[in-house]
Structures are given as C-alpha cells and as structure tokens.
C-alpha cells in the first residue's frame, strides 16, 4: 500500500509491520524512522542488505530467537535493492510475529520488483521520499517558526526558501 510521506504523520502505523522507504530525501526518511522507533519504544537493530544476503541463516535465526527481556524487534535494513525481495517473501511465508521491519532504499525504479510488491500488498507500507520542493520547504519553515512561537511574515519565509535552494 502506498502512503505518501506527508500522510505518514496522520496515519496510524501501529497496525503495519513492514515498511519500504525509498527515495533521495534521506533526512526526511531518517526523521520518519526515528518517529516510528519512538512510538514503538523498542531498540532497533540495524543491518545492511549485503550483510543479510551473505548470511541469511544468521539473520533468520536472530528473527526467530526470542529474548527474555524483549517482546518485539525493530529491524532496520539499509541500502536495500530488489535482491532483498526473496528475504521478504521468506519472512512473510514463515509468518514471524512480533517484528517490525523498515527497509531503507535509495531510488527504486517503477519496474522494481520490491517496490511493486510493497505497493500492491495491503499489509505492507511503501513510501516514496522525493526531494523537497518549494511548497514543502515553505511548509517546513512555517512549521518551524510556529513551534518556536516566532511571528514571521510570508515574505520572509519565501526569502528563506529561495535562499535555501
């Protein structure tokens, strides 16, 4: 299921366990990942795709092993490509419970198997993170000044946005 990046704050994400975040806006991706980690309140375990692909048995053992102190696991996998789709298929097939997996990818083409799979499945979340445009930057600047309780005109916000590009 596709959820736009600006909709993530308004959507209840607790019912989802698999997320694919892709695109070139790494700062915003990291911000959203931190919000999810804070909501779930569990420690995240970070991997890179090549680590998992080179030793998938070790990865699956870590998924299925339960600790006495932790009930859930949050797994963040960085630099994901289409090669990781087989791993996701296997996780879904094994029906492993109490895990949340966040896949962080760079640009994925429209023909990407992983992207298409996440977009079509209702239980999986796929979110693109594109470069900020003028409107997004203006909204971010406006929100920032509102949080700091600073009164600022629209002209000054526009000037800040123009200078930031």
What do these predicted ranges mean?
Residues 1-165:
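Conserved beta/loop motifs at nucleotide-recognition and modification sites
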């Amino acid at each position: 299921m596709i959820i736009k990046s600006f909709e993530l704050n308004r959507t209840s994400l607790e019912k989802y366990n698999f997320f694919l975040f892709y695109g070139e806006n790494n700062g915003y991706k990291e911000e959203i990942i931190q919000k999810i980690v804070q909501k779930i309140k569990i420690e995240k375990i970070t991997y890179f795709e090549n680590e998992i692909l080179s030793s998938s048995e070790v990865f699956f053992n870590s998924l299925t092993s339960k600790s006495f102190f932790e009930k859930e696991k949050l797994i963040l996998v960085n630099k994901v490509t289409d090669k990781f789709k087989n791993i996701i298929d296997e996780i879904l097939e094994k029906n492993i419970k109490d895990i949340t997996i966040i896949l962080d990818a760079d640009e994925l083409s429209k023909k990407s198997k992983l992207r298409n799979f996440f977009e079509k499945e209702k239980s999986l979340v796929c979110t693109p993170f594109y470069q900020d445009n003028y409107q997004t930057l203006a909204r971010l600047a406006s929100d920032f000044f509102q949080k700091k309780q600073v009164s600022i005109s629209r002209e000054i916000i526009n000037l800040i946005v123009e200078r930031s590009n």
